Amino acid sequence: MKVAVSGFKGRMGHEVVKTVLREEDLELVAVLDHEPKEKNIREIVEFSSLDVPVYANLSEMLEEAKPDCVVDFTTPKVGYSNTKTILEHGVRAVVGTTGFTPEQIESLREIAETKKIGALIAPNFAVGAVLMMQFAQKAAKYFPNVEIIELHHDNKLDAPSGTAVKTAEMMAENRTFVKQGAEDEVELMEGARGAEYEGMRIHSVRLPGLVAHQEVIFGAEGQGLTIRHDSYDRISFMSGVALSIRKTKELETLIYGLENILD
């Protein structure tokens, strides 16, 4: 299966390139960077034995390299337009870029179904993170008082994280609405109580040294429950990325969330 990587110079994109090279059934045919200094990936010491073209223009890459699937790890600013372009060219997409609105996801789903091609957008590709979200969804039925703390490296551009938003969405489906906190609480500093989704509070931490971490903290009379997942290295996401690439061959629609393709 021919694969191209968009955003290959980012930390996640770089790890995806190495993953595609390791997998026997996947072939790296192109990489994309918005301002490349190289014309071929072999100009990078780590990949000096390879012959893979570097593109600056997405449409040009799609037309010349003809990948079966594009993996996109870029930025929220261009994530939607990139995915739209990929699908409109009739190419499958695996997208780890976050920041999509529900309306954008539905628009992309319509394109995928019209073209009859598979695509997957996932806030998190770590299987452990998906299990955390599923456990939290189940717990929310019995513990409606809950807050989320998500922690990421300080270069992450969006807050709260896509994983935190997805977790809140899943819990809301299974949770009696409770507006967390005192009715007359006052923020002495704006934003002190975090963002709010369906009465739940979401707090974002950005610090150097972190990768991707999340706690879902439940409280009830006389007891508490904390569900936590930690990604210490970006390799934790790669099994999910490889699975998603292969899964797009079986799909004729866009799937949102890795949990929807796990058995």
Swiss-Prot record:
Q: Quickly give the catalysed reaction.
A: (S)-2,3,4,5-tetrahydrodipicolinate + NAD(+) + H2O = (2S,4S)-4-hydroxy-2,3,4,5-tetrahydrodipicolinate + NADH + H(+); (S)-2,3,4,5-tetrahydrodipicolinate + NADP(+) + H2O = (2S,4S)-4-hydroxy-2,3,4,5-tetrahydrodipicolinate + NADPH + H(+)
UniProt source species: Listeria welshimeri serovar 6b (strain ATCC 35897 / DSM 20650 / CCUG 15529 / CIP 8149 / NCTC 11857 / SLCC 5334 / V8)
Family affiliation:
Belongs to the DapB family.
Q: Where in the cell is it found?
A: Cytoplasm
* Gene3D superfamilies to which the protein is assigned, alphabetical: Dihydrodipicolinate Reductase, domain 2, NAD(P)-binding Rossmann-like Domain
According to its UniProt record, this protein's enzyme class is: oxidoreductase
GO cellular component terms?
Answer: cytosol
Keyword Nucleotide-binding listed? no
What is the protein's given name?
4-hydroxy-tetrahydrodipicolinate reductase
- What gene does this protein come from? dapB
Q: Which domain of life is it from?
A: Bacteria
Matches recorded under InterPro entries:
DapB_C, DapB_N, DapB_N_CS, DHDPR_bac, NAD(P)-bd_dom_sf
Q: Does the keyword rRNA-binding apply?
A: no
- Pfam family for this entry, one: DapB_C
- Keywords for this entry? Amino-acid biosynthesis, Cytoplasm, Diaminopimelate biosynthesis, Lysine biosynthesis, NAD, NADP, Oxidoreductase
Q: Which PROSITE patterns match?
A: DAPB
